[in-house]
Amino acid sequence: MIVRSLLLAGSLLLASVVPAAHAKSDGPEIKVKEFDKVPTNPYYFEDTDTVMLSGHMAELFISTDAASTWEPLKDKDGLLFPNRYHSQSAVIYGPNRKHWATFDAAKTWREFEVPEKLIFSNEGPRPFTFHGKDPNKVIINAEECLISLCRRVTYYTTDGFKTIKKLLKNDMGCYWAVGTPVFAEGQKDLPEKLDDRIFCIWAHITPFDRTRRLIYSDTYFSDDKFRAVEIGGREIKGVNNIALIKKYLVLAASSEGTSEAAIYVSKDAVNWGRAEFYGGPKIRGGSFTVLESTNYSIQVNAASRRSRRPIGSLFTSDSAGTSFTMNVDGVNEDEKMYTDFEQVSGIQGIFLINLVDNAADVKSGQSSEKKIVSRISFDDGRTFKPLKCGDKDLHLHSITRPSNMGRIFSSPAPGLIMGVGNTGDKLKEYENGNLYVSNDAGVTWRKALDKSHKYEFGDQGSLLVAIADDGKDELLTDEISYSLNHGKDWKKAKLPHKAAAIWLTTTPDSTSLQFLLIAQGKGKSYAMSIDFSNVHERKCEEKDFERWPARLDEKGEPDCLMGHKQFYRRRKADADCFVKEKFKEPVPETEACKCTKEDFECSAGFRRNKDYDCEPDGKLKPADGKCKNPDDKFMGPSGYRMIPGDDCIKKGGVDLEKEVERPCKDVTKAPASGQIAVEKTTFETKNLNYRYLERSDTSSGDDETVILRTDDGNLFVTRDHGKTWQRGKFQEPILQYIPHKYDHDVVYLLTQGKKAYWSIDRAHSFHSFEGKLPVTRTKGTLPLFFHPDHPDWLIWIGGENCNGQKCTDLAYYSKNRGDEWDLLLRGVGKCMFAGKKDELTADDLIFCSQHEHEDPRKNLRLVSSVDQFAKTTSIHFDGKPIVGYAKMSEFIVAATKNGTELQSFTSVDGKTFAHAAFPPNYHVGAEYAYTVLDSSTHSIFLHVTDHSAQNNEFGSILKSNSNGTSYVMSLRDANRNKADYVDFEKIQVVEGVAMANIVANADEVRHKGQDKKFRSMISHNDASEWALMPPPKKDVEGHSFDCKVKDKGTEECALHIHGYTERRDSRDSMSSGSAVGLIIGVGNVGPYLTTRAESDTFMSRDAGITWHQVRKGRYQWEFGDQGSIVVIVAEEKPTKVLSYSLDEGETWTDFEFTDKEVKVEDISTVPSDTSRNFLLWARGGSPGELIAYNVDFTGLKEREKQCVLKKESPEADDYYLWSPKHPQQKSNCLFGHVSVYHRKRPEAKCYNGPKLDRLSSEKKNCECTRQDYECDYNYERQSDGSCALVKGLQPADPMKICKDDPEAVEYFEPTGYRKLPVSTCEGGHQLDHIVARPCPNKKKEFEKKHPGIGGFGIFLAIFFPVTAATAIGYWAFSKWDGKFGRIRLGESQPESLFAGNSPLITIPVAIVAGTVAVITALPLLFSSLWRSFKGYTRLSNPWGQRQRPYASRDAFAARRGEYVGVVDDEDELLGAEEFEGDDDEEV
C-alpha cells in the first residue's frame, strides 16, 4: 500500500548575494540570491513569511521576509521535516544523533538527542511521525545495527522533545491513532486515552514474518502489556502497512498462499471492518494506492499486477470505508504506482483523472504504448466527462509527470485550475504541450500560453504566474509570464539572469503576491523573490467580488453535493485590484438542498450494482416469526442510509431510509434441517485427476473451488465444492494443470503445443498465452516454475529436438505472466527461482542444472545467476557433476558425486555452499540416493538410501543443524520405495511429532535378501529420539489384543501404521493442519506391520501418545471443520455408507450417501480441512464412470451455530487449552517452550468456521537446557553428545564483531555451541556466551560494563569457600559418573543429586576432574559468587537476548581483579579446554 506525497531533497551552497533588480512600475520587483548549487526543498511555514531551503552538505537557509533575503541557519545542519498538521512546527534531522525542533516557525529551536541513528529513506519510513492534534507528541523511528543487521527501535516524546523515552523494539512502524486533525471527530464512545493510543506493526521473529500483528497501547507500552487488533475475536496477522487518511485508519495485510491483500478500516481506532471491493479486480498486495480522499470516503487505485505498463481501477468507499465500488477502470499509473488522480482543491466532488483509452490492448500485450486521455468528474466519481477546450478534447499531464512541487492542477484559489497538455485524441509528450487554464473548476478551458510552463497561483487566484519549462529543467529563459484576469491575458517580465526553472512556488494558501523561483543558470543557481505587490495600487472593494458557485449541473445551475451547494467569494476576473488578504484562505459558504438519492449510501449488508442502486450483498434475515412460507413478504431494510456528514433537508426531499416490503425468497436459508445433503455428478474418465484451489487467510469470498481434468483433456470447475460443475471451453485438449505454488488463486493450463492458459481469479476466467517452445516432454521435468514473492514471474521449460520422452530443454523467463519471454539457458535439467524476501538470497536469484556443453547426454552441473544469466553466471562445485538439487524452506541442498562418494552441500544465501558433514563412520557411496524430507524447523531431514536393492530399498534419516552443514543420525533403516518416497511424516501443527516406518530385519534384508518387515516409530522431540507406539488396551469391540504392554510399545507388541509409501495420493496425510492433535491411520497391533488387507483403522487424539481402534478393517478418512467433523469410508470395497464423528472419534454415526453400492476411490475436502463439505470420488458400474458425491454437513443441528472463542478467557466457552506431551523428555518443553493450543471441546455443539489461530498466546517459555543448543560452525557432534572442534579447522574469528561493528564493546570466545534458531528458551543455561573479552580500544567501556572487585572481597571469596569447595569437589569426583568437561546435546541424565540440572551442579563449585582443576577453577568460582551477591546476574546484548558474562581461568590469571562472572552455569563448562597441550579437546 502506498500513500504518496512529493518530498524532494537536494543540496546547495550559498555563494554570493546579487543586488536586487529594479523592475518597472508595471511589473514585479525581483530580488536574487546566487548559489553554487541548486537550492532545493523550499518550505513555507504556513501563515508566516518564513521560508527555509535545504542546502549543500545538509546546510539549511532561512528567510523571514518571504524569500527576499536569506541567512544560513547557524549550527543546525540537516534535513527539515515539517509537521504538516501544525504549521508552526518542524524538526531538523541532524548528524551525529543531534537534532532540533521548532514550535514557533523557526524563531527558536530546541536541541535533543536520540541514542540510535534515525531511519530515513525517500520511499520508506520517515524518522518522525507527528500526532494529528498535539504538536508535542512525536514518534521517533530509529534503528540499532550490529554489523550489517539492523532492527527498529522506536522512541516517543509527549513534551516536544524535552524528554525522550523508548517505546518498542522490533517494530515495523508505529503510528498515532489520532494521526490526522480530523480523526474520530463526531464519533461517540471513544476510548478514554485515544489521544495517547499508538499502533505498531510488530514482528515477533523477522520483518518478513507472516505473523506480523498490529498491536496497540494507551500507556506507551510502559507496562509491557498490549493488545492486538482483532476482528470477530481473531487477530489480524500478516500486517504490511497502515495509513492514516483523513478520518480513517487503513490497514493492509497479506497471507501465505495468495497475492490478494486484505484491507481493514477503522474510524475510531477500536472497531475494525474488512473492506470489500465490488465491480473490479481483487486488491493485491503491493499493487494498490490509497489516493487523496475526503472526510466521508476513501479513494483507492488498484493496479493490474501483470503489465510492465501498469493500469489501475479507481474505487470509492462508503462513509464507513469498508464497502468500495469501482468508479472507473483503466486509470493511468507509473511503475512506482503514482496515479494520475487529483481532487480540485477546496471544492467537494470534483477531480481530474487520466485514463488509458486502450487499456484492454495494453493489458493483453497487444499494444506497448498507452493512449492516455483526461477526464473530469463533478459528482464524486459517479460519472466522468472529457475536458473541453472549445469543441476539442483536452488532455493534461498529471501526477505521473510532475514538473513542479506541490499540487499539479489547483490551489486554494477558488475555481482556478491550470495544466500542461494538448488537444486531440490522446496526451502527447510534455515538451509538446501548451499551458491551459480554467476559471470555473474545469467546466471550460482556454489555452493560456504556447509551450509547456511551470505555474503558480497567488492572491486567491487573481494573479497567475508561469515560466517556460521543457520538462527536463534545461530550458534557459530570462522572462516570466503573469496574468491578472484569470488567464485571459498575459504579460511578461524580465528576469535578471537567464536560467532554467527548477521550482516555482509561493505560500501554501496561495494568498501572497510574492513568489519564489529556484533556477539554474550557466555555472550559477538562483533563488529569486518575485514580488507583485506594487503592480496594482488598489485593494479590492466589495464591488470587485462575485458570489461564485463551485459546482454547476448540466444546466449551468449551482449543483448540490453532500446535501448543500458550495459558493466562494471571489475577485471578478477583470477587476483591476488585488485582494491583498494575506494568509486569509477563502472559506466556502454553503446552502442546504433537499435530499436526493445522491445523499444516501448503501447500508451494511448491501452494495451498489451497475445501476448505482443498493442491493443485498447476500441473503437477508427476516424478523422472528416472519417468512414461514416462501411466498410471504416482510418489511425489511431499504438498503440505504444517509451519508454521515450530509446536511440535506429531508422535508420535501427523498427519504430512502424507510423500510420496504421484500419477498421472503430473498431471506437467508432455512434453519438447519438436521440432515446431511448429497449431490451427485457423473464424469467419464478412468483416471482421477483433481485439485482444490485453497483459500488463504486474506482471501475474499467464500467459494470452495475444485478443478477436474478428464482423460480426454476436458476441464471441469466447481465453485461450490462439487454441488454444481461447469465445463471449460478451450480450443485444445488440456494436457495438464499446474496450480501456482505460492498463489492459490492462480492456475495454469498447458496443452501439447506452445499455447497455454492462466487464471488469476480462481478459475472464473482463463486467458491464453504462448511459450517460446512447446512444454518439455522430458520425463520427470516440470515445465513451469514460480517465484515465491512475485506471482507473475515464470520460468518455462520448453523442449526442442524431442525424441520420445527425451528433449533438449531450454529455459525461458517472463516477468509478466507470459506476455514476453527471454532466454535463460539451453540444455537445462531444471531451473527455479531461489530468491525470497525473508531469506538471505537475492530476489533475482535463479538456479539451473545445465548439461555440459548443452548436450542432454552429458552430466549436469549447477549454475546460478542474479541477472537471468545475461552477464554473470556462477558455476558451483567447480563444474563437477551434480546428482540433483532442491530448495526446501531457507535451504538450497545439492548432491554431487566425488569418485565413489556421494556428497551433500547446503547453502542459505545461494552463493556459498558448505559441505555437509555426516556422522562419523557413515560413508555415503556414489550409488546411494538422497531424499530431502522436511525443513520446517530450521533443520533439514535427509533420507540417505544405503540399501537400494529392487523393492527392498531403505536407508537412514539424518537431521541437520540450523545451517544444514552438520548432520546427526536420527533413525536408521527407515523404509523407502523405488519411487524415492520415504515412510516419514511430520504431524501437522503439533511441534516436534513425527512418525516413520523402519525395516526391522534390515540385516536379513541386506545379507540374505529377505523381504522387508516393518515397525512403526514415533518421535515427540523433533526426531531426536524415537520409540515404538503403544497399542490400544482394547479393540473397538472391547476385546483385548493378542499381546499386551503396560505403557509403551515393545518389539513384541506395538501399534504399527502403514506409511507414506503406500498411499495412492501423496496429498493424503495422517494429520491435519487445523485438527490439532488428531491422527488417523491404518495398521495393526503386533510385532510387525502386516499387509494393508489385514489392517484396521486407528485414531489418536493426543498427537500419538495414546491410540484407540476406530473400525475393524481399513478405511479412508478426512477431517472437516478443523477436526470437529471426521468422516471415514471403507477402502477398496463396495459400500453405500460413510461414518462420521462429531466428537473427535469417540462415537460414530453411519450415513447412507447412495442407494447403490459403489467403490470409493478417494475422499477429499479443502486442504485446510476447514470446510463442512466433502467429496467422495467413487466408481460406478460402467467402465470409466467416475461419480463425485458432494456430502454437505452444514445442515446438521449440531453444527448450526459458530463456536465462541474469547482470547481473554479462552476456556470459558466452546474451547479449551491443550498442551502436547513429550514422553521422551522429563519436561514438556520443546524448542524452549511449552506450546499451548486452542481446541474445541468435543461435546460443544457448534462449528469452528474460518481457520483458527490454533497456537495460543498462553505459550510458556522454558529455561534453556542443553537441548536448546547445537554445535557451532566448524564444530561437530561427538558420539557422546558433546561438540568438539573438527580436526584441522579453527573456530570462527570471535573478534569479527569488533571489526564489523565499531561500537561493539566486547566479544565472546567460541564455546562450540550456539542456540537453536527455533528455541525461545529464556535464562537457564547460557552455553553460547561464556567468556567475555573487550574489543580493541574498548577496555574502559568493558570495565565499566564488568566492574571488578576489591582485595577484601577477593579474600572473603577465597577463604570461606575454599575448604567446602575442595571437599565437595573430592566427594563429587569419587561419587559421580565421571562425565566431566562436556556439554552433551539431547542426552538424558537420571534424576539424582548430581544430574546435569541439579542445583549442586548448577552452581560452579569445583566439580572438576582432580585437584589441579579445583585450584585453577577457584577464581571463576569466587568471581561468580561475588557477582551473584552483587546482583550481576545478567547483561543484555544488543539483540535483547539474555546473555551471561563469564571469565575463563586464563582471563583471571592475565587480568587480576577484572573478573567477568557467571551465575548458575553447568559444571560441565569447567573442563580442560584451556590446557592447550592436552590431547583432550572437549569443551
UniProtKB/Swiss-Prot annotation:
Coiled-coil blocks: none
Bilayer topology: Multi-pass membrane protein
Signal peptide: 1-23
Pfam families documented for this protein: Sortilin-Vps10 (PF15902), Sortilin_C (PF15901)
One GO cellular component term: Golgi apparatus
Superkingdom assignment: Eukaryota
TM region(s), chain numbering: 1348-1368, 1400-1420
Lumenal side: 24-1347, 1421-1483
Residues in the Cytoplasmic compartment per record: 1369-1399
Any GO BP: Golgi to endosome transport
InterPro entries: Sortilin_C (IPR031777), Sortilin_N (IPR031778), VPS10 (IPR006581), VPS10-sortilin (IPR050310), WD40/YVTN_repeat-like_dom_sf (IPR015943)
Residue windows of the BNR repeats: 376-385, 436-446, 482-492, 716-726, 1098-1108, 1140-1149
Main location: Golgi
Keywords, comma-separated and alphabetical: Glycoprotein, Golgi apparatus, Membrane, Protein transport, Receptor, Repeat, Signal, Transmembrane, Transmembrane helix, Transport
Entry annotated with the keyword Iron: no
Glycosylated position list: 295, 898, 963
Protein localization: Golgi apparatus, trans-Golgi network membrane; Prevacuolar compartment membrane
Family to which the UniProt record says this protein belongs: Belongs to the VPS10-related sortilin family.
Role this protein plays: Functions as a sorting receptor in the Golgi compartment required for the intracellular sorting and delivery of soluble vacuolar proteins, like carboxypeptidase Y (CPY) and proteinase A. Executes multiple rounds of sorting by cycling between the late Golgi and a prevacuolar endosome-like compartment.
UniProt-listed PANTHER family: SORTILIN RELATED, SORTILIN-RELATED RECEPTOR
Protein name: Vacuolar protein sorting/targeting protein 10
Native organism: Arthroderma gypseum (strain ATCC MYA-4604 / CBS 118893) (Microsporum gypseum)
